[in-house]
Design a protein with these regions (language model features):
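Catalytic cores of nucleotide-sugar-dependent glycosyltransferases that transfer UDP/GDP/TDP-activated
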Residues: 1-479
Length: 479
């Protein structure tokens, strides 16, 4: 089967969040299963020079944006058997950063059309075009409206994946008709209209052949008012057209047995993990105390990550409990300031690394006993999967993908790979942390829960098969 992924970011070329991790890893798994899969991205200024030097010029075309035709260069490179195409246009993508520009509606309108105009140039007719988040969500509608009479595009089916419903791509009406060239008949409540504007995310949901999101729990949550951000009614109406498939991680990249960034490589031995803990305590200038539970967070310092809960309980936890706490991340300046101040108050119990450093994050995962992730909402979450891959036992709130991937430890059966609490409540979180540290002090139970976490399959293999089934289903139903 021929597959094309269209997305706004992909690691390691350009990344702002978990979307880039998915686009980097899922195509590799599908390629390993025998699929002819390719990926198309914008060629941003921020792509590192070493990748730019490897790109080959494939061709060029012109893309209509309103009354103008814009240059569209096409470059490519091959990574692990997957061809990555880059759409080159200096006016739209030769800027710092990726998002947040006043003309994002125009920039990504260009990109949506460029993805389709690219296909004849590279002589590739995908069976399925898989679009990700609002940045590529107009592609199914373009196929339905602008390209419907062109036989080259007739057989293409579409899948649309919602990675985060919070960001929907809402722009004025003119983007639809004047820039994209889509007929105004689609500007209805049943189409793309959203409170007098055009909603890209809504277009993907309405016009794709199948809609997925990144965990079964999140698929249920977004059908409610609290998580649906105005689209809950539409999503509730999708029925079997909406699926939730949990993300995986790249287990070759995240592998404690081969990771050169950690102090001591290990497969399953908790003794070697203890050596990583000691090395992390030394690196962060904390007292070396292998018997004390070390809890970590690797996170963006933003509201959605549950940091207000952490702030409410941290003084009590560090003052009364025998525990060390380390945090790594950047974000809201008020959170950055608070965590710095807390680390100053408890220099023997806490370290706040207000930066992001990928090698250091690996050492956090390898060196910590517990990994705290009390998110307000979490469509899937990848950090908890990486933590478990490195044997750091997660403490999570039961939301989104956290609920699907972390299962509370049962002392009687020995089952479970972490600890969890349901309500968004600081008191409940504190009780869960204290239960986890109590289990930590019971070696027999701690070995079980740690090995359960360390021994799980967090690869993309199972999820990739689920996507394969959807691709086969929508191509057969239209055959």
């Amino acid at each position: 089967m021929k597959l094309l992924f269209a997305a706004s970011e992909c690691g390691p070329y350009i990344k702002t969040g978990g979307l880039a991790d998915v686009i980097a890893a899922l195509p590799k798994s599908l390629h390993g299963m025998g699929e002819d899969i390719r990926v198309v991205l914008p060629k941003y200024r921020g792509i590192p020079e070493d990748y730019r030097e490897r790109m080959a010029h494939v061709g060029e075309t012109r893309v209509r944006v309103g009354w103008r035709e814009q240059y569209c260069g096409i470059e490519s490179l091959v990574e692990d058997g997957v061809t990555i195409y880059f759409i080159d246009n200096e006016y739209y993508f030769g800027r710092d950063g990726i998002y947040g520009y006043m003309d994002d509606g125009e920039r990504f309108s260009f990109f949506n059309r460029a993805v389709l105009e690219l296909l004849p140039v590279i002589d590739f007719q995908p069976d399925v075009l898989h679009c990700h988040d609002w940045h590529t969500a107009m592609i199914p509608l373009l196929l339905e409206d602008v390209y419907r009479h062109d036989p080259y595009y007739a057989g293409i089916r579409t899948v649309f994946t919602i990675h985060n419903l919070l960001y929907q791509g809402v722009f004025p009406y003119e983007v639809l008709v004047d820039l994209l060239g889509i007929h105004s008949r689609h500007f209805t409540a049943e189409g793309v209209e959203y409170y007098g504007n055009v909603n890209f995310m809504k277009a993907g949901i309405v016009y794709a052949d199948h809609v997925t999101t990144v965990s079964p729990t999140y698929a249920s949550e977004i059908q409610t008012g609290y998580y649906g951000y105005g689209l809950d009614g539409l999503l509730s109406a999708q029925g079997s057209r909406l699926s939730g498939i949990v993300n995986g991680i790249d287990t070759k990249s995240y592998n404690p047995a081969t990771d050169s960034h950690i102090a001591m490589k290990y497969r399953s031995g908790l003794n070697k993990k203890t050596q990583n803990k000691i090395a992390l305590q030394e690196e962060l200038n904390l007292p070396v105390a292998p018997h004390i539970p070390l809890m970590s967070m690797v996170t963006r310092l933003v509201d959605s990550k549950g940091l207000d809960l952490v702030i409410r309980i941290l003084d009590e936890l560090l003052y009364y409990d025998e525990i060390q706490f380390v945090v790594l991340g950047t974000g809201d300046p008020s959170y950055e300031h608070w965590f710095r101040e807390a680390a100053n108050r408890y220099p023997n119990k806490m370290s706040a690394q207000i930066r992001f450093n990928e090698p250091l994050s690996r050492r956090f995962y390898a060196g910590s006993d517990l990994f705290l992730m009390p998110s307000k909402f979490e469509p899937c979450g990848i950090s908890q999967l990486i933590a478990m891959r490195y044997g750091s036992v997660p403490i999570v709130r039961e939301t989104g993908g956290l609920n699907d991937t972390v299962h509370a430890y049962n002392e009687y059966t020995g089952e479970g790979n972490g600890f969890s609490f349901k309500d968004y409540n600081a008191h409940d979180m504190m009780n869960t942390i204290r239960r986890a540290t109590a289990i930590y002090r019971q070696p027999e139970h701690w070995r079980k829960v740690s090995k359960n976490a360390l021994g799980g399959d967090y690869s993309w293999n199972v999820s990739a098969k689920e996507y394969q089934e959807i691709y086969q289903q929508i191509t057969k139903s239209h055959a």
